[in-house]
Amino acid sequence: MTTIQDIADKMNISKSTVSKALNDAPDISETLRKQVLETAVALGYTKLRRYKKPVKKICIITEKENIQYEEPHHFAYDILLGFRQMAEPAGFDIEIVPVDVQMQRNQRYDVFMLEHDYVGAFAIGFSLNDPWIQEFKTSHTPAVLFDNYIIGNPSTAYVGIDNDEGMELAVSHLAGLGHRKIAYLSGSLGSQILQIRHA
């Protein structure tokens, strides 16, 4: 397990400076703090103190250009509500964090998670072109992706719907109503789920 001393040795700075940077001390520059966070992630460091806190933080990361969740009629409203209804009674503090492509380019996923003391994330609304989708392939901080599937990373899991059954039910229902010309209208194929449905 990587220690604060390992980070200090790698960066040739003191252990106390690393500790201050990891704990957002005001006398550490933003540049140095970011360098320490990047080095910590590269070495596989996790903040042990975040696991000792009585409340663990999980973020729901929404790709703000692709998903809406604020109102009851929005697609992700009930999904996020259900997630909170299960996680909060289990002792987790849930924060919804909208992100965009620029933010993802500016800060790596693991660094973001370490910086904000999140123990894990639920990610919804991400397209295949989003930078963090690529990072989920090698990230160390646990993430559950909605309708995106990453192979080979034990820290990344997937939840979604059975598209085959959903399409079969929809077509059967419409055919049962007497419809014979049935079409499927899709958005752009920039998301994994739309590519699966298109195939």
In which residue ranges do the predicted regions lie?
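Bacterial carbohydrate/catabolite-sensing allosteric modules
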Residues: 1-6, 10, 42-43, 47-49, ...
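A short acidic, amphipathic alpha-helical/loop segment
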Residues: 108-109, 131-136
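N-terminal helix-turn-helix DNA-binding module of bacterial transcription factors
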Residues: 1-55
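Short beta->alpha connector loops
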Residues: 100-104, 124-129
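Periplasmic-binding protein-like
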Residues: 118-125, 183-186
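Short, flexible/disordered intra-domain loops and linkers
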Residues: 66-74, 104
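Structural motif
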Residues: 94-115, 167
